[in-house]
Amino acid sequence: MNIRHAAPEDVPAMQAIFEYARRFMRENGNPTQWGDRFPTQEMIDRDLALHRSYVCEDEGKIAATFSFTTDGEPTYQVIRGAWLDDAPYGVVHRIAAAEGTHGAASFCMEWCMAQCGNIRIDTHADNKPMQGLLNKLGYTYCGVIELENGRGERLAFQKHA
């Protein structure tokens, strides 16, 4: 597997992965985190423009997609709980793997860790598969953050290399 910046021509494959992820979430007790239209095309376009959008390729096919930045996350400034530290960190958002892939999400998370050595991430309380992945990868539960515009709460996790 390898990671690269996403390109506009990757968007159809990324959208197919997001559609599968939404269906997977609904079928696994998490119908509201991404609903029917998240992430929006505007979010995808913004991630591409800011060079925050990545794809994971496996044998020439896009196996996963995610957003990654080391520019911080405004919603992480206030947490009910405590982050492990105040050091600079990377943020992973909108990680999703294609149907039938194995190990792509772990590979993406490990790649992000290799970029900066300190990762923060959040997920929905109903997203048990993601919580399981974070636990398997050694992330520490730090508390609860509030999304912007009153869109709800998320469980917050952090890990150091």
Model regions and ranges:
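Conserved acetyl-CoA-binding loop-helix of GNAT-fold acetyltransferases
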Residues: 97-114, 131-136
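Conserved acyl-donor/pantetheine-binding loop and adjacent beta-alpha core of acyl/acetyltransferases
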Residues: 67-100
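A short beta-loop-alpha structural element at the N-terminal edge
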Residues: 2-16
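Conserved active-site alpha-helix within GNAT-family acetyltransferase domains
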Residues: 126-143
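Conserved beta-strand in the GNAT
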Residues: 55, 61-71
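Conserved GNAT acetyl-CoA-binding A-motif
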Residues: 115-126
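Conserved GNAT-fold acetyl-CoA-binding loop/helix
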Residues: 22-42
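Conserved catalytic-core motifs of GNAT/GCN5-like acyltransferases
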Residues: 122, 140-154
